[in-house]
Amino acid sequence: MGVGKEVSFKESFFLSHGNPAMLADESFIARNFLLGWKKNVFPVKPKSILVVSAHWETDVPCVSAGQYPNVIYDFTEVPASMFQMKYPAPGCPKLAKRVQELLIAGGFKSAKLDEERGFDHSSWVPLSMMCPEADIPVCQLSVQPGLDATHHFNVGRALAPLKGEGVLFIGSGGAVHPSDDTPHWFDGVAPWAAEFDQWLEDALLEGRYEDVNNYQTKAPEGWKLAHPIPEHFLPLHVAMGAGGEKSKAELIYRTWDHGTLGYASYKFTSI
């Protein structure tokens, strides 16, 4: 049983959520993309939102199932005002149960509900700018960094029917997300970052999803700097899988911080 048939979507999205400080610091130009979400990217109000979070790591897929989740202040080095901010969107236990049902039906041995999990900054920070009214129910889905990209693609494939039930599907991570100790690049974009980012764009727009799933052997060597650990890349694979059996990828935004942190974001539309 679905979660509703009032609206139906063909799109799933991957967003590079970037530095959480952008919520309070207007110097971040990526704010403009998120603030313009409803006007420029997705004007239809969904029934609910499912966010695949780079900041929730588990051994098996877990989905937040609480009715009134709190926000999690899982960051440092941000304006002090952010620790007073809230995002009072309700949870959606019905959607959480539907996610669990679809994953089990899709062949996953385990999919857990977590009634205590709050909204981490993968969701509440971008949603505060995208949907500031906080009147749309939200669930979060975890990633499994111990499992490969194909696993995450298959998670998305199993959850693709949600789009037809009025659920806005968002993978929230980072297209290029190096370690914190990676030196900044002050002359444009670091060559390794630009090369990986361009490879990713080309592979997605050309429909070479298998190459993206196998990025550790298909991508330029710079992938080791772009994603030294995979948790920020895996939400892209879930969103890519949620595009459905056939989908077309589109780059919808790109900018950089410090020449190394890439904000490329994509839309996957079923055709």
UniProtKB/Swiss-Prot annotation:
A GO MF term: ferrous iron binding
Keywords assigned: Cytoplasm, Dioxygenase, Iron, Metal-binding, Oxidoreductase, Zinc
Domain of life: Eukaryota
Predominant cellular place of this UniProt entry's protein: cytoplasm
Tissue: Expressed only in colored petals and pigmented tissues, absent from green stems and leaves.
EC number: 1.13.11.29
CC annotations in GO: cytoplasm
Protein's pathway: Pigment biosynthesis; betalain biosynthesis
Chemical reaction(s) catalysed: L-dopa + O2 = 4-(L-alanin-3-yl)-2-hydroxy-cis,cis-muconate 6-semialdehyde + H(+)
Keyword Iron assigned: yes
Localization per record: Cytoplasm
Keyword Transit peptide applies: no
Similarity comment text for this entry: Belongs to the DODA-type extradiol aromatic ring-opening dioxygenase family.
Record function comment: Opens the cyclic ring of dihydroxy-phenylalanine (DOPA) between carbons 4 and 5, thus producing an unstable seco-DOPA that rearranges nonenzymatically to betalamic acid.
Other information: In contrary to the fungal dioxygenase (AC P87064), this enzyme does not have a significant 2,3-ring-cleaving activity.
Protein name: 4,5-DOPA dioxygenase extradiol
Taxonomic source organism: Portulaca grandiflora
